[in-house]
Amino acid sequence: MMGSYETVVMADAIAYVNGDGTLPDKPVMLTFDDGYYNNLLYALPLLEQYDMRAVLSPVGSYTDRFTDTPDPNPNYGHLTWEELAALQTSGRFEIQNHSYDMHGLSDRRGSSRKKGESESAYARAFCDDTERMQQLLSLHGIEATTYTYPYGAISDGSGAFLREMGFAASLSCYERISVLVRGEPASLFCLGRFNRPAKYTTAEFMRHMLGD
């Protein structure tokens, strides 16, 4: 990879922190959210061409909808459950949890707590939705270890809920380089990510990410 960066996925990061694995000298993680069909159409061939891997976090309700009524349109279509399972099996994509149906911007921003919502009501809503997605992923042979916050909207308490449900990590939308620390599982939560707007070239994006 350009500049000797090597792609890793969440399994690599988790193994490193737990003392069960190593990371390359210059690790980088490619992440794709929502589960768009164009990840299969365009990204998979490129990952194969350049011998890379990536993390894909689909929204379960979108996957259900397009499984019931497939529409392989690269502009707006989403992947089916069968396609997600095939991507996981390919070894190029690692599938994670992006909520079942908490990807909205109405009274609740993503999976965050609504204004005036009690702590217990929020815990129930968040955990029920997350567990529903976990069960669907598992039904299709996918065991997600990481929660990818919709819109990066994070509320107090959600991290504890994720740990109680057995998650080992979470991805935020905070634009920062993450530091993983061996023996410190907390360093796997709210990992930073840099959004790549279409208007930037790869060179411009890398300069922004590295602070050059």
Locate predicted features.
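Aromatic-lined glycan-binding groove of carbohydrate-active enzymes
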Residues: 84, 93-102
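Active-site-proximal loop/turn and secondary-structure-junction residues that shape catalytic pockets
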Residues: 60-62, 99-101, 153
